[in-house]
UniProtKB/Swiss-Prot annotation:
This is TATA box-binding protein-associated factor RNA polymerase I subunit B. It comes from the Eukaryota. It comes from Xenopus tropicalis. Although it shares weak sequence similarity with GTF2B/TFIIB, displays a similar subdomain organization as GTF2B/TFIIB, with a N-terminal zinc finger, a connecting region (composed of B-reader and B-linker regions), followed by 2 cyclin folds. The RRN7-type zinc finger plays an essential postrecruitment role in Pol I transcription at a step preceding synthesis of the first 40 nucleotides. It is found in: Nucleus, Nucleolus. Residues 70-74 are annotated as: B-linker. Residues 264-374 are annotated as: C-terminal cyclin fold.
Amino acid sequence: MEEEDARGYNKPCPQCSEVNWAISDEGTFYCKSCHTVIEKTREVDDTEVFSTHGKLQSISRGLRKKRKLEKGWEWYVCEGFQFILIKQAEALQALGVAPQIKDEILCTFWRRYLQKTNQAYVKRPVYRSVLTCRDSDSSATEVDSDLEAFSIGTSSVSDGYTSDASGRLSLPTEDIPSASESAVSVHSGSVDGLSHVKMRKNFKPWNYVKMTMPMTLAFCYLALLWLRASITLSDLLRFVFEKHIPYINAHQYLPEEIKVYGHDVRIFRMQALPVYNDILSKAYELGAFLDLPQFPPITKNCYLHPSVLCMKYLIEANLPDELQQWTCQVAEKTGIDDFHRLTFDPACKRASHIRYDVQAVALIILVLKLLFALDDNTEWQLSKFAERMNQSNKEKTVFDLQSWYQTVRQCYEKAQQKLEEEYGRFMWKSDCPLYYSQTTKSLLQKRKQMSENLQRQFSKLAGAAPNTGKQGPSSFLFKWEEQNTDTISFHGHSLQAVLHQGKKPPTPINTHYWLNSLRKCKTRICQHSELYEESNFPRSYHFMVCLFAFLLRVEHCVIHHEVGLIEELFFQEKKNKRKQKPKKQEMTDFREVPPD
């Protein structure tokens, strides 16, 4: 066949001058006498190419077999959450939290949760209808160093559960079906993924707290609260958004042997950022479910105490340091600084939720209302008076609220715009995409490759700067410096323009105060704590609420509602003192609220 195809070429060989050609397997011509290869190749008809290609495709389709389901470990959902909790604890350690948070605090909480939900440390789990046993020979050779430090099965536990070399749970061998009878669900990578998704909250006979991704943050917050660490709940959620703590796409931290697909996607995939009140409610619910003892007391030296947090947010908001003594007085009069009130006790179910950071900024706003009124009139008159004092006396700078407003507003608007851009560029998809079934895996991989190519091309066209990685974590969002005229520091400014200097103790010049709510709402169905209308309040007050809501990354209604609660305590205390004191004696601390 090769000789017949080469008969049409009659040119002599340039090496030996003979005409004795043949065609190689690659389609090139060579001389059979001297084996010289020339550049000429075989000419192929188009119809022959298409017919041959079609035959190859049909043959390949006929011989192709269905790809078997990728199998790894036979794992449970609680094991996946255990890996994620390990990574979150390590991230908190990297942020400066004490090492006890991983091996002692968080580990103890997790063990107690597994025992309470009958998933471990019990003889017979009540919810697993089908138990599977892993091949101990294959798993014993692989040692996971991460799980060794956080093993939930120890030799001290004698209830039928142990831990193998890889750190995973090893179930008791009695009443477990053989490997041939193992029934791992084809709809999920985990053994109990389907049952975990369909499980209701008050499913009998448990009445348990269902484990979810937001619940992992509740575990972390309880551990931070137990250690009295210098990380508030708002800081924790901000670190989650900045990806310093694994939460979004946390499944990529799982080992390769743990296959996540099907119903597992609904468990470990998060499409929204955590909400402040939601995580706080889950933390209180978790603490009551675990029957935890009373947490260590929050004393004046603790970071979560109002005096410390108020000073922190005064620095953050670029407000004068002299406001600190006023916030301490209000906290003392309302009883907010009492350690009995600040300490978390899971056994006290009727106690209100303690929002340490929100409570601190609400104290600052209340003090600003006492000194400046924040009614769109009084504060600007006081600012003009402070401006005249600064012109006449340049030795000590007096705090000017109008100048502060112009400086802080400019920085706030820039930071707000930057945050909105970060929200728009936030990457929800991970490098390890999740898929619901094996049939959609190839399709999702093609879509991912196409989106990456398009994103790369658009970034080249737009001339965008390459991503340099995430910035280092910081407790402060703003940096106020005296050298930069755009960010003037107001920390050392005096409050002489708003106080009567002749009296001891000094009292505010402002004698008016307006309340956020005229009447206390006693119903729980109106949801007044979730309502906040900007048009109903002065613009200066609204700016204060927006500023501190931005610093804490919470909704405006959360700040506004907390201010109303502290106002209720403050003026109720003043009302009680007014009844006890004689009529002729005047109040020397704060002015009374004018009667209606």
